[in-house]
Amino acid sequence: MKFRVLIEQDEDGMFIAQVPSLPGCISQGKTRDEAIRNIQEAVIGYIESLKEHGDPIPPSIDEEILDVSV
């Protein structure tokens, strides 16, 4: 499954990762890579919780987001 993850760096230098299609699924890390690892774990836990409660799992995505400099 693939989910869109938004990563932003806050004013303290921490990287905040969140999954818009999974409300409340947010994690952070001191580095971008750490934030990615942490959000992967958070998504796994989130999906497991949905399954345990019999809630539907949001559909995965098949798209790519790119940054373009102008």
State where each predicted segment sits:
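A short, exposed loop/beta-hairpin motif centered on an aromatic-Gly-Thr core
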Residues: 23-32
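Short, charged, surface-exposed hinge/linker loops at domain edges
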Residues: 1-4, 37-70
